[in-house]
Amino acid sequence: MTGSETASPILKPGGQSRDPRWLWNLLVPLLTGMAALMIYLITIAPDLTWANFGSDGGELITASITSGVAHPPGYPTYIFLGKVAALLPFGSVAWRFNFLSAVSAATAVAFATATAQQVRMGGTKIGVAAAAAGLSLAFAPLFWGQALISEVYALNSAFLAILLWSLLSGRSPLLSGIILGLAITTHLSSLIMLPLALVLSARSRWVIFICGLLLGLLPLLTLPFLARSSSPVVWGDPSTLSGWLWLVSGRLYYANLRLPENSEALLRLFYFGRTLLQQWLGVGWLFVILGITSNLLVKRVTLALIFTGLIYLLYGFFYQTEDAIVTLLPLLILFSPLLAAGFSKIGAWSFVLPLLLLLVNFHALNLHQEQSIRPLAEAVLIAAPEEAILLTPGDQSIFTLWYFQYVEGLRDDLVLVDANLFAFDWYRERLKNLYPDLIGLDMDNLDAFRKSNNQERPICDVQVTLAGVANCTP
């Protein structure tokens, strides 16, 4: 594309003309997003939940409510938008953050539909096929699941869908840059979209795009100020340049990106392949292939979408964490225009796929009555001796207890200490600030910490599980 080109890069040459049905073209994405939101609100979790890889929810909510810094890269954009969601006058605090995810996911659906509408057949926008593709994204189980819980993936999906719409509809490169920057602040994997953005932008406008990108990254500069709060959730020490770089680069998790063992690789390949097929019931991927071969999109755009989707797939495959599969959500967004192009061949029949997805997945994904975590956490906290130190064994337990103590105010006399985080100097410094009477925080020696404090406070090893493990020593 040259600098003189102003046409949307998704369209075949000669296929662009002003569509007089502009109101209809606006309503299709809007109604699609609203339909998705309605289903999300019917199935949304009413409280804190670990469902759908949601165990980070307690930490993210606590960080937002207490103006803290979440796990790397800190997620400042989520922190600030969460504060807005927390102002809602109804529902539990956790529900309000779940609602933020639902709105974010519905926004992603609306913009994915708007992007798919840019595909034209004979000069006419494929509104019906675009709506069907948007709803197929909405009811894909991986995507739907993230719309119901407190996590960053739905918000990240919203920014990525807006970015793709901006790029493929020929919007301002400044806007595209800002949106990509914000997407990166909600998940570092969004850097994968940078080559796509450059390919779909005129080279003469790259400087404007980069300026927008830097503007979108500005929330990361708020992390040193958030770290000055009294929040229990402050990862790293972003008050120094080296500490800030450690945090925003996600260096803590570099070790997770590695080759799987030979025996694990086949199992992981099967898991990823099966999960991807499930998203669109297998048959949807046939329409993606049909869309690729339809030539309704500019070849370079098709190749760029496929290449970027494959990079996300490789990233998820080699990122060795339990929730790595969720990093494939952008792939579904990227392939939505291709799905719409394939759907254009069958018209209204394309709605069969989202309808089947809705029927097949509704029961399994419905979290409307999911409140299993609250009694588990309350049992641990209520049973603890007065002013005890509770030692947790890892993220799931400490994140959950943070929420119930700091957000809901349950048992604020207790001291929460995580055994895994104790190894970090910055975490022990945070404990010193929160609990000045604690001793034994100068070195990474948990046994010495126990011995130094068990004369003043009972110490309990606790774990928030179905068994509600709690072992205390006076």
Task: List each model region and its residues.
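Aromatic- and kink-enriched transmembrane "portal" helix at the membrane-lumen/periplasm boundary
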Residues: I42-A45, I79, L87, G91-N98, ...
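Membrane-interface alpha helices of multi-pass inner-membrane proteins
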Residues: T62-T66, A133-L135, A161, P173-H187, ...
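Signature aromatic-anchored transmembrane alpha helix within multi-pass, membrane-resident enzymes
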Residues: V128-A131, L214, T302, A341-N361
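Hydrophobic, aromatic-rich transmembrane alpha-helices
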Residues: L277-R300
